[in-house]
Amino acid sequence: MKLAILSRNSTLYSTRRLVEAARARGHTVRILDPLRCYMRIAADGFSMHYKGRPMTGVDMVIPRIGASITRYGTAVLRQFELMGARTPNPSDAILRSRDKLRAHQLLAAKGIDMPVTVFGDNPDDTVDLLSMLGPPPHVVKLNEGTQGRGVILTEKASASRGIVEALRGLYANFLMQEFIGEAKGADLRCFVVGDQVVASMQRQAPEGDFRSNLHAGGTAVAAKASRAEQQVAVRSAKALGLSVCGVDLIRSARGPLVLEINSTPGLEGIEAACGVDVATRIIEHVEKLRKP
C-alpha cells in the first residue's frame, strides 16, 4: 500500500511511530507537509502536486493536521479523497471535531451525555444565558481551542459575565459549560481505533489547575475504561465520522460525560502510559479500510 502521512514535522513522535509501524508491515510511506501540497480542481479531474512534482497513486492518507492549519490541511485531504485515496478520518469529520459547538450538537443529537453547554451572541442575553447553565463554577472554552488553551474556570457569576463581555469584545467564538466538581481535575482519554478502544489513560491536572491536558502540565497513568465508557467513546467517534481519535471523558455522578474529541491525538503520552503499540493498531486498521 502506498501511504501518505500529512504532517508538518517529520520528527514528531507520532509521525515517526506511524512511519515505523507502516514500514514494518511492508508499506511504502511518504510524509507530506500539507502546506507544500497544492492542487488543480477542474471538471476534467483533480490533481495534486508536492514540491513541484505530481502526487499520484496514493492509496491511503493518514492526516496529522494541526489546529492552526485546519482549513488548508482539510482542503488537501479532501483533494486526495476526491482523487480516490482512502483515509481513516475524512476531511469533513475533522472539521466537525475541530468545531466544539458543532461537535457537541452532533453528540447530543445521538443521545451522548456531556456537561451542559450554552452558547449565545447578544450581550443583552448574557444573564439569561448563564441562568440556563446554572450556578457557578462555569467553564468557558474558545470554540476552536486545543491542548487546554483558551479554557477558563470562573468561580462567580460576576466573573462569568466579565469573561463573556471580554471575549465578545475580542469577537471570539466561545461556549460555556457546567463545571463537574466530582471529577477533581481528572479525565479519561480513550484512544479509539475502528470499533474499539485500544488504550486508555487517566490524566490528572497539576496542583491548582483544572485542565488535565498533558500540554498544560497534566500527568497520565494507564487506566481501565469501563464497558460503558468504551461504548460512549466509540459512539462519539462514530457520531463525528472518525475512526481514529482520542475521546476525552470525565467520570461524573451521572456517568461518563464527553468533554472533547481529538481527531489528531498524540501517540507519545498514551503509548508511554499504557505500553500499547497504538501506531501498529492504526496501521492494521487502515489496511482493513483499504481492502475492497
Curated annotation (Swiss-Prot):
Mn(2+) 2 binds at residues 260, 262. Keywords: ATP-binding, Ligase, Magnesium, Manganese, Metal-binding, Nucleotide-binding, Protein biosynthesis. Mg(2+) 1 binds at residues 248, 260. One of its GO terms (biological process) is SOS response. Mg(2+) 2 binds at residues 260, 262. ATP binds at residues 141, 178-179, 187, 211-213. InterPro entries: ATP-grasp (IPR011761), ATP-grasp_RimK-type (IPR013651), ATP_grasp_subdomain_1 (IPR013815), RimK (IPR023533), Rimk_N (IPR041107), Rp_bS6_RimK/Lys_biosynth_LsyX (IPR004666). Its EC number is 6.3.2.-. GO terms for molecular function: ATP binding; metal ion binding; ribosomal S6-glutamic acid ligase activity. Residues 104-287 form the ATP-grasp domain. Mn(2+) 1 binds at residues 248, 260. Binds 2 magnesium or manganese ions per subunit. GO terms for cellular component: cytoplasm. Pfam families: RimK, Rimk_N. PANTHER family: RIBOSOMAL PROTEIN BS6--L-GLUTAMATE LIGASE (PTHR21621:SF7), RIBOSOMAL PROTEIN S6 MODIFICATION PROTEIN (PTHR21621). Belongs to the RimK family. This is Probable alpha-L-glutamate ligase. It comes from Stenotrophomonas maltophilia (strain R551-3). The lineage of its organism: Bacteria, Pseudomonadati, Pseudomonadota, Gammaproteobacteria, Lysobacterales. The gene is rimK.
